[in-house]
């Protein structure tokens, strides 16, 4: 017998229900993983609310990534073995004691990568790919990172520093979070409740603007971001936490060669899964050498996923939130 968090109707965190279900059986080309921990992503919150397409049709199991030990192989799987520690992108949701995943979505873990760090798989890949694949960050450039104390944001700050960014400007929601992102390598910190981030960036850069902007907010944050994006700059949108659309006029882009780029790790999983493995290998190496650290902001029992969602929605924590089946 297995257990999972199931969403049968959209709504507040109380719709996250702990339910028994049959132990999943891996199909050909899949493996089954006994989960030791799974991460909470903001996309899970949006899926629960019904404002994001990640959840699919009701009912569904939330969650994008999981870490655990392989306990059964499906037919035709020869490159993996029972007992192997892995991170994975499951075929279904990850808020479960057992998940199945395609073999090509399984990423073995070395002894020096902890389960807790690996549970940030989606965030790690997103932070790396937004900076390097989407934005094509170059040494010496200025980077602006929204929600810099959050799961993706705190990793992006560190990765931008490793990539040789000349200046990292972090946008956060409180003074406590400002100290946190400075400790990760941010050069300048803007508290969004007290400052106009676009005006502050233009002042800090002498009017030249940021070369790269990572935007998980959308709406007017995207619109204002274009006013502090440097000529030939790249604004990468990888989320829409505001739930609001942005209105962009094309003259804003072509006259100064500014680019707005969309990015989704979920979309890569579906359409170009082979593109993910190189990114995973890079972030695994950075974790193994302690060049990159995943900050665990809070941990909850998997059965208490509702409390984890409440914690995230409170907007008070930093870093990654974990769920543990035990």
Name the predicted role of every residue range.
Residues 22-40, 51-93:
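Glycine-rich beta-strand-centered segment in the early N-terminal region that forms part
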Residues 81, 119-194:
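Mid-domain Rossmann-like dinucleotide-binding core that forms the NAD(H)/NADP(H) cofactor-binding site
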Residues 196-207:
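Short amphipathic alpha-helix with an adjacent loop that forms part of the alpha/beta core around
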């Amino acid at each position: 017998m297995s257990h999972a968090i199931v969403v049968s109707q959209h709504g507040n965190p109380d719709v996250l229900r702990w339910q028994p279900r049959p132990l999943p059986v891996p199909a050909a080309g899949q493996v089954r993983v006994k989960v030791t921990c799974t991460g909470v992503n903001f996309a899970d919150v949006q899926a629960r609310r019904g404002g994001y397409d990640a959840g699919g049709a009701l009912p569904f199991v939330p969650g994008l990534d999981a870490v655990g030990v392989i306990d059964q192989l499906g037919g035709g799987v020869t490159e993996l073995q029972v007992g192997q520690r892995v991170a994975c992108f499951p075929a279904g949701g990850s808020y479960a004691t057992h998940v199945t995943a395609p073999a090509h979505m399984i990423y073995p873990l070395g002894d020096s990568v902890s389960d807790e760090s690996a549970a940030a798989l989606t965030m790690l890949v997103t932070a790396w790919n937004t900076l390097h694949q989407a934005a094509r960050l170059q040494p010496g450039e200025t980077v602006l990172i929204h929600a810099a104390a959050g799961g993706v944001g705190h990793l992006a700050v560190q990765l931008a520093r490793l990539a040789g960014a000349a200046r990292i400007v972090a946008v956060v929601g409180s003074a406590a979070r400002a100290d946190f992102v400075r400790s990760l390598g941010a050069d300048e910190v803007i508290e969004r409740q007290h400052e106009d981030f676009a005006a502050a960036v233009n002042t800090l850069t002498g009017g030249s603007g940021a070369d790269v902007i990572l935007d998980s907010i959308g709406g007017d944050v995207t619109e204002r971001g274009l006013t502090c994006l440097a000529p030939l700059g790249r604004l990468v949108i990888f989320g829409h936490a505001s739930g609001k659309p942005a209105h962009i006029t094309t003259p804003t882009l072509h006259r100064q060669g500014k680019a707005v780029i969309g990015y989704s790790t979920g979309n890569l999983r579906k359409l170009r899964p082979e593109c993910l493995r190189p990114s995973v290998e890079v972030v695994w190496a950075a974790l193994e050498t302690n060049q990159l650290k995943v900050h665990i902001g809070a941990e909850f029992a998997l059965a208490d996923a509702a409390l984890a969602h409440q914690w995230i929605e409170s907007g008070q924590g930093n870093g990654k939130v974990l769920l543990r089946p035990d």
